[in-house]
């Protein structure tokens, strides 16, 4: 115990230097989705909303409403529609304004 304490004082925190330096493990983190409006159709948006376990997605007319604050980055939507949804790679999403986390994605894809 004493050894670990002294080593910790000498080296400081060694598990990560984030945010002072980029975290090497960040590329392995699951991140919220990014949507391609031109690849989204109304039907696809409805299907994505139906499979989202956290209720982070719903369609409002020709807009897919995405609540980043409710998203758990589970990846189901990206697996369902890989052409329209990809991982964003973003995880620094903290904000004091809840409304910033509500994204309105226009649906521009044509129905097949
Ligand atoms: S990653 Fe999961 S929780 Fe987030 S929007 Fe997609 S299905 Fe919903």
Question: Which residues are covered by each model-predicted region?
Answer:
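Non-ligating segments of multi-cofactor redox enzymes
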Residues: 1-61, 68-70, 74-112
């Amino acid at each position: 115990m004493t050894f670990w304490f002294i080593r910790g004082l000498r080296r400081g925190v060694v598990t990560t230097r984030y945010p002072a330096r980029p975290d090497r493990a960040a590329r392995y983190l699951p991140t919220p989705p990014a949507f391609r409006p031109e690849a989204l159709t109304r039907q696809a948006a409805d299907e994505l909303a139906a499979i989202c376990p956290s209720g982070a997605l719903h369609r409002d007319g020709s807009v897919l409403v995405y609540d980043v604050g409710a998203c758990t980055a589970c990846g189901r939507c990206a697996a369902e529609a890989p052409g329209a949804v990809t991982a964003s790679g973003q995880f620094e999403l903290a904000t004091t304004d809840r409304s910033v986390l509500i994204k309105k994605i226009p649906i521009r894809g044509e129905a097949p």
